[in-house]
Amino acid sequence: MQRGGATAPAGIGTGEGGQRMATTKPGIGRAAARAHLSACPVLGPVVAQVGPLRLSPVRREPYEALVRAIAHQQVHGRAAEAMLARLLALAPAADFPPPARVLALPEAALRGCGFSAAKVAAIRDIAATAEAGHLPSRRAAARLSDAELIARLTALRGVGRWTVEMLLIFTLGRPDVLPVDDFGVREGYRLAAGLDAQPKPRDLATIGEAWAPHRSAAAWYLWRAADLAKQARREAPAAM
């Protein structure tokens, strides 16, 4: 099971640029999502505090998105970005190291980027699958449902549901994905609801049914709730 950190994985794409969130259904967008979530007793105050939804997918091929998501598994966002920067430096002529380049790199070079042995194995498997033509392109992925992509991509080494959910939200712009295994999402809900403990993933999934068809936006606001609490803790000593 993969879990994110306390906040949305920055390198995957948090949509801070204020661009429109891509959707797969006409009429589902930022204004509709905000209005729907504002009616929730728990999320409503978060929406009011955070303001407009700024979730925007980054146009990447699933290969790149999955490698980036692997980097972000169970580490702080800054650490993941440092590892990815070292990986990019190994293929300076490309925007992102192509599968063939990754497969040609010795394991020591990938370990030198900071990736664990498990992450190196996962990245190599993703690259090999892409090089063989068995990883769907962005265009092909757009024709598959969320469930189909989760079933297909979790067959890859090291790729769990959370990893695919990050691709669905931040690369494909799917509007109704709630990553209940994500620490930041559950922590955001705990804070917003005033709970002593985080909800269990299955309980949050049940709670989140009321947020459909805007569960990706709900996740974004829950990440922001966790961010705001983290920021408040950092600023508290300075205010004393």
Q: What residue ranges belong to the model's regions?
A:
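Short polybasic linear motifs
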Residues: T7
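C-terminal end-helix/capping segment
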Residues: D182-E209, M240
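N-terminal polyanion-binding entry modules of DNA glycosylases/AP lyases
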Residues: Q2-G4, G13-L144, T206-M240
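Alpha-helix capping at helix-to-loop junctions
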Residues: A89, A93, A128-L135, A155-G158, ...
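A general secondary-structure boundary signal
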Residues: L84, A151-T154, P201
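Catalytic DNA-binding helix-loop module of base-excision-repair DNA glycosylases/AP lyases
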Residues: A71, S145-L191
